[in-house]
């Protein structure tokens, strides 16, 4: 198999990198040891920066139906802190999505860009 770019790992970063490379006209193969969709027990939180990246990638349409949060709440040692998102050039909200859905949505964007998948 010949390819210009081999991306190993079809999580959010790998799938996004593969999509951007394919959109730049490169022949891209995206390899992952698992079969998709697959779940991971970590990383469900989406910061405003993550929301902005999903928007830029064209993968944010499914996130708009999810609950939004306006910041983080940290509790411990007898106190609770509320930390609002900074805003500025980023969206003023965050969200959360199960990795089962997030990873699959970004991977589908990569496949739509012409990426060749290799799974399992």
Label for each model-derived stretch:
Residues 1-13:
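Beta1/beta-strand and adjacent pyrophosphate-binding region of the FAD-binding site
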Residues 10-13, 17-22, 110:
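Small-residue (primarily alanine) positions within well-ordered alpha-helices
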Residues 1, 52, 68, 74-120:
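Conserved N-terminal helical subregion
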Residues 39-77:
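N-terminal FAD cofactor-binding segment of flavoenzymes
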Residues 26, 59, 115:
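Short phosphate-binding/catalytic loops that engage adenosine nucleotides
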Residues 6, 22-42:
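Glycine-rich FAD pyrophosphate-binding loop
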